[in-house]
UniProtKB/Swiss-Prot annotation:
Protein's job: Catalyzes the irreversible NADPH-dependent deamination of GMP to IMP. It functions in the conversion of nucleobase, nucleoside and nucleotide derivatives of G to A nucleotides, and in maintaining the intracellular balance of A and G nucleotides.
Catalytic activity: IMP + NH4(+) + NADP(+) = GMP + NADPH + 2 H(+)
Protein's UniProt keywords contain NADP: yes
Gene name tied to this protein: guaC
One GO MF term attached to the UniProt entry: GMP reductase activity
Binding site for NADP(+): 203-226
Organism from which the protein derives: Staphylococcus carnosus (strain TM300)
GO biological process entries: purine nucleotide metabolic process
Family from the record: Belongs to the IMPDH/GMPR family. GuaC type 2 subfamily.
InterPro entries (alphabetical): Aldolase_TIM, GMP_reductase, GuaC_type_2, IMP_DH/GMP_Rdtase_CS, IMP_DH_GMPRt
Protein name per UniProt: GMP reductase
Length: 325
């Protein structure tokens, strides 16, 4: 198995067949809906909130609402669907979550997407929760994770998951690899490639995305959707506290298993950092789309599928030519 990560790989260009990159289509069918970009903000408290979820849905972008406001999930589903927007929520695997799924069915609420969101998703608990959701809400598109192996992908798909989320601790505010010795940090792109060999359904690449080019690389190696945390953090609309340090504005960004999210120092696998203020999300999404259109034009195609067919080289950390922040 080849081991590499995002900064180790360069994609090789093909002959361009478009007059302008604006001809390139970045949209993706994911579950019951089509979205403008194969990108989803991380379902973290410092990245996503209800107001942003509404904005993303209105503008044809995929989102996943985090699971840290358990009481607010049913009102959120009702509000989104009353507005004619899709509902995409997260659940855990504790006993009360089984009751929650049952309650949704009893109330006739059918969120279009449910993500089962735990750090180590290759587990009987996740498999049982997939079956619970599919039993009570058979039409809901179920995303399950996180996993880092082909065996994990295969087992969750076989249990009924419609998509899997791949990545164990490669994110900027995740310290799983340091705290536990396990994870896909440092070889996340190779893990996506490895898992894609077993996947029969869509995969979400989750974590380790540092540049827009990494989105194209994720798709090349098998992802249908790419989850982004730090690149979406610290915008004007982002949740999180704004602070001024040395005359510059920053926003806090912390991991979902950090003590800042948990409110206690127990089983901590996340940390907190401050990210420089970046302007508006709309501007970032526009730039992301334009960069991905350029990627497609370099791939010699007109849509995302062309990215899957390009060749690549492994260059071992040299793509920055020593010029790194």
């Amino acid at each position: 198995m080849k081991i590499f990560d995002y900064e180790d790989v360069q994609l090789i260009p093909n002959k361009c067949i478009v007059k302008s990159r604006s001809e390139c289509d970045t949209s993706v069918q994911f579950g019951p809906k089509r979205f403008k970009l194969p990108v989803v903000p991380a379902n973290m408290q410092t990245v996503m909130n209800e107001k942003l979820a509404e904005w993303f849905a209105e503008n044809d972008y995929f989102y996943i609402m985090h699971r840290f406001d358990e009481e607010g999930r049913i009102p959120f589903i009702k509000k989104m669907q009353d507005k004619g927007l899709f509902a995409s929520i997260s659940v855990g695997v504790k006993d009360k979550e089984y009751d929650f799924v049952r309650e949704l069915a009893e109330e006739g609420l059918k969120p279009e997407y449910i993500t089962i969101d735990i750090a180590h998703g290759h587990s009987e608990q996740v498999i049982n929760m997939i079956r619970q959701i599919k039993s009570y809400l058979p039409e809901t598109f179920v995303i399950a994770g996180n996993v880092g192996t082909p065996e994990g992908v295969r087992e969750l798909e076989n249990a009924g998951a419609d998509a899997t989320k791949v990545g164990i601790g490669p994110g900027r505010v995740c310290i799983t690899k340091i705290k536990t010795g396990f994870g896909t940090g440092g070889w996340q792109l190779a893990a996506i490639n490895h898992c894609s060999k077993a996947a029969r359904k869509p995969m979400i690449a989750d974590g380790g995305i540092r540049t827009h080019g990494d989105i194209a690389k994720s798709i090349r190696f098998g992802a249908s959707m790419v989850m982004v945390g730090s690149l979406f953090a610290a915008h004007e609309e982002s949740p999180g506290e704004t602070v001024e340090l040395d005359g510059k504005l920053y926003k806090e960004y912390f991991g979902s298993a950090s003590e800042f999210q948990k409110g206690e120092h127990k089983n901590v696998e996340g940390k907190k950092m401050f990210v420089e203020h970046k302007g508006t999300l709309a501007d970032t999404l526009t730039e992301m789309q334009q960069d991905l259109q350029s990627s497609i034009s370099y791939a010699g195609g007109k849509d995302l599928d062309s990215l899957r067919k390009v060749d690549y080289v492994i260059v071992r950390n040299s793509i920055f030519n020593g010029d790194r922040d």
